């Protein structure tokens, strides 16, 4: 019985430690998300073609940062101000009005954890996001996110597949408006559409185009992309 307990504890320790080791490996290469693997195993269609961030239209990563995580360059994996806002929402009304997850947290979840809301998942996600921010560059974190995010209703993952589905072109050819439309459907590409955007998506896109031009995000981009 004791041996069984030791084996179980060792297995649990290895499962918890594995993402921290894999993060070091994922400084290079073209990793896939747990959701992509799950869809493959379930026999669903998965379309993903990796594209380096340098080969994407610059408007896409800029606009995604503007829409998903405006403090991306200044936080260390967790936006604690946003976390406090979420906690305040829960205390005031019992439901958070905004998600609060940074791009780094979404990378942690997409690469190593599972979808859906869970206290256990969040407890694993927070230290993992801080570790990812510590060992990977901001540019690499963003590159990972842009290549593993779900970007279409039929198994399109990554910016290249998303751009091809929505606009019939590569991620390198996106206009600022098209990039903003793609950013506007995250993280719900099965509910929102960049291909046939409704008024709400169009309004969001216009907002994100303006945000991407802010001085703070322009500086963020220069410091982390070399452009």
Swiss-Prot record:
<dbReference type="GO" id="GO:0071555">
    <property type="term" value="P:cell wall organization"/>
</dbReference>
<dbReference type="GO" id="GO:0008360">
    <property type="term" value="P:regulation of cell shape"/>
</dbReference>
<keyword id="KW-0961">Cell wall biogenesis/degradation</keyword>
<comment type="similarity">
    <text>Belongs to the glycosyltransferase 51 family.</text>
</comment>
<keyword id="KW-0573">Peptidoglycan synthesis</keyword>
<dbReference type="GO" id="GO:0009274">
    <property type="term" value="C:peptidoglycan-based cell wall"/>
</dbReference>
<dbReference type="GO" id="GO:0009252">
    <property type="term" value="P:peptidoglycan biosynthetic process"/>
</dbReference>
<dbReference type="InterPro" id="IPR001264">
    <property type="entry name" value="Glyco_trans_51"/>
</dbReference>
<keyword id="KW-0808">Transferase</keyword>
<dbReference type="GO" id="GO:0016763">
    <property type="term" value="F:pentosyltransferase activity"/>
</dbReference>
<keyword id="KW-0472">Membrane</keyword>
<dbReference type="GO" id="GO:0008955">
    <property type="term" value="F:peptidoglycan glycosyltransferase activity"/>
</dbReference>
<dbReference type="InterPro" id="IPR036950">
    <property type="entry name" value="PBP_transglycosylase"/>
</dbReference>
<comment type="pathway">
    <text>Cell wall biogenesis; peptidoglycan biosynthesis.</text>
</comment>
<keyword id="KW-1003">Cell membrane</keyword>
<keyword id="KW-0812">Transmembrane</keyword>
<dbReference type="GO" id="GO:0005886">
    <property type="term" value="C:plasma membrane"/>
</dbReference>
<dbReference type="InterPro" id="IPR011812">
    <property type="entry name" value="Pep_trsgly"/>
</dbReference>
<dbReference type="Pfam" id="PF00912">
    <property type="entry name" value="Transgly"/>
</dbReference>
<feature type="transmembrane region" description="Helical">
    <location>
        <begin position="7"/>
        <end position="27"/>
    </location>
</feature>
<protein>
    <recommendedName>
        <fullName>Biosynthetic peptidoglycan transglycosylase</fullName>
        <ecNumber>2.4.99.28</ecNumber>
    </recommendedName>
</protein>
<dbReference type="InterPro" id="IPR023346">
    <property type="entry name" value="Lysozyme-like_dom_sf"/>
</dbReference>
<keyword id="KW-0997">Cell inner membrane</keyword>
<keyword id="KW-0328">Glycosyltransferase</keyword>
<comment type="function">
    <text>Peptidoglycan polymerase that catalyzes glycan chain elongation from lipid-linked precursors.</text>
</comment>
<keyword id="KW-1133">Transmembrane helix</keyword>
<keyword id="KW-0133">Cell shape</keyword>
């Amino acid at each position: 019985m004791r041996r069984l307990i030791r084996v179980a504890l060792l297995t649990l320790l290895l499962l918890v430690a594995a993402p921290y080791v894999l993060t070091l490996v994922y400084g290079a290469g073209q990793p896939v998300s747990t959701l992509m693997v799950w869809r493959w195993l379930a026999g669903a269609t998965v379309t993903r073609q990796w594209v380096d961030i340098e080969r994407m239209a610059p408007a896409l990563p800029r606009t995604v940062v503007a829409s998903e995580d405006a403090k991306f360059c200044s936080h260390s994996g967790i936006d604690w101000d946003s976390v406090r806002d979420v906690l305040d929402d829960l205390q005031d009304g019992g439901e958070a009005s905004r998600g609060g997850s940074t791009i780094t947290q979404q990378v942690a979840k997409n690469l190593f954890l599972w979808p859906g809301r869970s206290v256990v998942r969040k407890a694993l996600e927070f230290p993992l996001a801080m570790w990812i921010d510590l060992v990977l560059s901001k540019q690499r974190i963003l590159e990972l996110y842009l290549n593993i995010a779900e970007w279409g209703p039929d198994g399109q993952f990554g910016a290249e597949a998303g751009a091809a589905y929505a606009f019939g072109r590569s991620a390198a050819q996106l206009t600022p408006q098209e990039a903003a439309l793609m950013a506007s459907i995250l993280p719900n590409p099965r509910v929102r559409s960049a291909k046939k955007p409704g008024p709400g998506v169009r309004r969001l896109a216009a907002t994100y185009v303006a945000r991407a031009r802010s001085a703070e995000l322009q500086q963020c981009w220069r410091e982390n992309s070399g452009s």
